[in-house]
Curated annotation (Swiss-Prot):
This is Ceramide kinase. GO terms for cellular component: cytoplasm; membrane; plasma membrane. It is found in: Cytoplasm; Cell membrane. It holds the Pfam family CERK_C. Catalyzes specifically the phosphorylation of ceramide to form ceramide 1-phosphate. Acts efficiently on natural and analog ceramides (C6, C8, C16 ceramides, and C8-dihydroceramide), to a lesser extent on C2-ceramide and C6-dihydroceramide, but not on other lipids, such as various sphingosines. Shows a greater preference for D-erythro isomer of ceramides. Binds phosphoinositides. It is a peripheral membrane protein.
Length: 537
């Protein structure tokens, strides 16, 4: 039995799964470790030593020894055994987390209580963990399993971690957004949405809008500096598309997401504002797509009766239609970023690129604050015009089950930029080659008809709408000249597409987009780099 001080390690010989083990708790490293120790004394930890960071312990409970089988074997040596159970995170394959339990048996009641008290005191110091959450459940999204998923996989973990909740099962579209505008959100430590990307978007818009209203910020002003919210958003995937969850956690698994919420993880994420004629249309965190992806989402809305199959049907129809759209894209390159769209360095937990880019962007903003001119008037805008099959802007990789690397594999979650991908008019065969590369390890940008830029602002004007939206075009002409390439004339009728904004249709072709660096925070930590499955045995 070991003694402990304020910051001294606690070490004892206990029993785990009928094996004699040395167990150590190191406050300085916030680490619980145990290893087999068959001989006298604790011994040194070997290769089979197990460990759990205190930050990944969910709860510690005194074990009901009468409910355990102790009538045979080595338990006979203990006249009155005592035990405590550590509930913790266990890493599984493919970035999944599992709820694991390890029970430690003690020969003395005093020793058992010492371990319980010490572990609980360390857990109390973890101030980033939520205590009270507001939960929105979409009972209709995906396969209609939202309520069942929450009750079976999430609620037990919240109860174990002593997290209290207020639950709202939504009955109509935009209910979550409207609720966040009306209620007192200061009493919560975070907002949890159970559903797909659509449900997350509702909560995102409600939280950002409520925060700006409280701060007196006009969201309709394209140059407005938006105020970040102090609340984090948790996503429990239960929808037809879970792109945001997959790109920030690495998997679409409800138990994994619930555990990230319980341990109080925090991940800052960029948000793009989309304006038209000084009116806010929407916010975007994943994909803004014009042309191919815009046509798919618009067509699929007419076929909701097909269920999830509508996306495949509309995708095939749009591919065969092979429409291209003429227009002008003007953008401000993201000079503050330390990466590039083709550097093959994906965003991972503790991302260096996001940290450095955030710091450099803050330095730029300070210089602009004390300078004579605004930074965007000093920096050089660029313009690309032509006929495009697709124009995509991604704030994240947009990875999902079908495309594990996403639309832009090296896009970063919190670097204050968006990857602008322009797909020029090409043959159906070449466009198919481009799409197929999203499902494998090949570089989807390695085509002559594909251009990709890392930007912090961009504007688009459709050729068909140039007369109506000439103010955007004329503003661009004063600052820069056009960069045009010679391409075969389009055989399609010149017309307008729609924008796919995180799965919602925007009917205005002319938009102005600005990236707001790390505007919101999620209960996530980013995708971990090659995590090894844990063995708490």
């Amino acid at each position: 039995m070991g003694a402990t001080g304020a910051a001294e390690p606690l070490q004892s010989v206990l029993w785990v799964k009928q094996q004699r083990c040395a167990v150590s708790l190191e406050p300085a490293r916030a680490l619980l470790r145990w290893w087999r120790s068959p001989g006298p004394g604790a011994g040194a930890p070997g290769a089979d030593a197990c460990s759990v960071p205190v930050s990944e312990i969910i709860a510690v409970e005194e074990t009901d020894v009468h409910g355990k089988h102790q009538g045979s074997g080595k338990w006979q040596k203990m006249e009155k055994p005592y035990a405590f159970t550590v509930h913790c995170v266990k890493r599984a394959r493919r970035h999944r987390w599992k709820w694991a339990q390890v029970t430690f048996w003690c020969p003395e009641e005093q020793l058992c209580h010492l371990w319980l008290q010490t572990l609980r005191e360390m857990l109390e110091k973890l101030t980033s963990r939520p205590k009270h959450l507001l939960v929105f459940i979409n009972p209709f999204g995906g396969k209609g399993q939202g309520k069942r998923i929450y009750e079976r996989k999430v609620a037990p973990l919240f109860t174990l971690a002593s997290i209290t909740t207020d639950i709202i099962v939504t009955e109509h579209a935009n209910q979550a957004k409207e609720t966040l505008y009306e209620i007192n959100i200061d009493k919560y430590d975070g907002i949890v949405c159970v559903g797909g990307d659509g449900m997350f978007s509702e909560v995102l818009h409600g939280l950002i809008g409520r925060t700006q209203r409280s701060a007196g910020v006009d969201q309709n002003h394209p140059r407005a500096v938006l105020v970040p919210s102090s609340l984090r958003i948790g996503i429990i995937p239960a929808g037809s598309t879970d792109c945001v969850c997959y790109s920030t956690v690495g998997t679409s698994d409800a138990e994994t997401s619930a555990l990230h919420i319980v341990v109080g993880d925090s991940l800052a994420m960029d948000v793009s504002s989309v304006h038209h004629n000084s009116t806010l249309l929407r916010y975007s965190v994943s994909l803004l797509g014009y042309g191919f992806y815009g046509d798919i989402i618009k067509d699929s809305e007419k076929k909701r009766w097909l269920g999830l199959a509508r996306y495949d049907f509309s995708g095939l129809k749009t591919f065969l239609s092979h429409h291209c759209y003429e227009g002008t894209v003007s953008f401000l390159p993201a000079q503050h970023t330390v990466g590039s769209p083709r550097d093959r360095k994906p965003c991972r937990a503790g991302c260096f690129v996001c940290r450095q880019s955030k710091q450099q962007l803050e330095e730029e903003q300070k210089k602009a604050l004390y300078g004579l001119e605004a930074a965007e008037d000093v920096e050089e805008w660029q313009v690309v015009c032509g006929k495009f099959l697709a124009i995509n802007a991604t704030n994240m990789s947009c990875a999902c089950r079908r495309s594990p690397r996403g639309l832009s594999p090296a896009a970063h979650l919190g670097d204050g930029s968006s990857d602008l991908i322009l797909i020029r008019k090409c043959s159906r065969f070449n466009f198919l080659r481009f799409l197929i590369r999203h499902t494998n390890q090949q570089d989807q940008f390695d085509f002559t008809f594909v251009e990709v830029y890392r930007v912090k602002k961009f504007q688009f004007t459709s050729k068909h709408m140039e007369d109506e939206d000439s103010d955007l075009k004329e503003g661009g002409k004063k600052r820069f000249g056009h960069i045009c390439s010679s391409h075969p004339s389009c055989c399609c009728t010149v017309s307008n597409s729609s924008w796919n904004c995180d799965g919602e249709v925007l009917h205005s072709p002319a938009i102005e987009v600005r990236v707001h660096c790390q505007l919101v925070r999620l209960f996530a930590r980013g995708i971990e780099e090659n995590p090894k499955p844990d063995s708490h045995s």
